[in-house]
């Protein structure tokens, strides 16, 4: 289209006119990343990576450092915001068939794995009860690896149990991984702009494009302002909304919490891990809960890209979202009936989505052929 070339030559970045609010989460994630990097840097200045001093150094940041409470709360709540945005971003990708842009989808999945690792290392740093025991449970999964598992665990811990060397390396990893996230994000954005974003209809947007600025840039700014306002409201009035009460006590290896659980954004994976009564099987399921996303570009069978015009698959998609929430809820409960059965059923349904999705695409193709 002539106007598209004119826009491109004027550096106006032509974008499809019909992209909805679901397309704003990329810029929200970029804002979250900037906030996390900035607040993380100021927290790292005052933090001490030592098992005897870590807990008191976090207390010192909150109580004595000027505006330290803002930095600490913004970093902790910002992590939750980050995951709310990223899960919505992924759900949008699944719904609108954006995974067919393979390079973008696979780089995004790699980004998610690095992000989850970074968040896990960060959760251990305050050295509270839940930090210590969550680290013990998750790192212990390495022992499930046949033959080399125990040696690998000892090497990772830097000793025969979680101790000072473990905290030091977790801090080093938590500091370095965000730079990898920034690099991968740049690659992710470059790959996206190589082909251009899709739209809710799943059609070729070249026929109707408008300049990114001012139309979409103002929309981005509005949603970012809303997100930051929400962040400040939670930080001011409900700062401990996402915190675990156990983490207000210093780590004690001799006292086990009644119910060990990670942060809410890992509960879906933790629920899947717990639903399998076998260490290696559970570890494999835990890894697959995230890695299975990489199969989506290769198992798409429908002639239609987006779910906008696929009502049968829409039902399956929303069942998948409900399943995700159910697993998250059951993971907060103790391992006892009826939660064991609910967790196992929900975990089975979670993986079943990735099998049913391509089959339904094939069925829908057949229905359309009959109608034609």
Curated annotation (Swiss-Prot):
Disulfide bonds: none annotated. The keyword Transmembrane applies. It is found in: Mitochondrion inner membrane. GO terms for molecular function: metal ion binding; ubiquinol-cytochrome-c reductase activity. Its main location: mitochondrion. Its cofactor is heme b. It is a multi-pass membrane protein. Keywords: Electron transport, Heme, Iron, Membrane, Metal-binding, Mitochondrion, Mitochondrion inner membrane, Respiratory chain, Transmembrane, Transmembrane helix, Transport, Ubiquinone. InterPro entries: Cyt_b/b6_C (IPR005798), Cyt_b/b6_C_sf (IPR036150), Cyt_b/b6_N (IPR005797), Cytb/b6-like_sf (IPR027387), Cytochrome_b (IPR030689), Cytochrome_b_C_euk/bac (IPR048260), Cytochrome_b_N_euk/bac (IPR048259), Di-haem_cyt_TM (IPR016174). The chain crosses the membrane at residues 25-45, 69-90, 105-125, 170-190, 218-238, 280-300, 312-332, 339-358. A ubiquinone binds at residue 193. One of its GO terms (biological process) is mitochondrial electron transport, ubiquinol to cytochrome c. The cytochrome bc1 complex contains 3 respiratory subunits (MT-CYB, CYC1 and UQCRFS1), 2 core proteins (UQCRC1 and UQCRC2) and probably 6 low-molecular weight proteins. Heme 1 (or BL or b562) is low-potential and absorbs at about 562 nm, and heme 2 (or BH or b566) is high-potential and absorbs at about 566 nm. Component of the ubiquinol-cytochrome c reductase complex (complex III or cytochrome b-c1 complex) that is part of the mitochondrial respiratory chain. The b-c1 complex mediates electron transfer from ubiquinol to cytochrome c. Contributes to the generation of a proton gradient across the mitochondrial membrane that is then used for ATP synthesis. This is Cytochrome b. It comes from Pseudechis australis. The gene is MT-CYB.
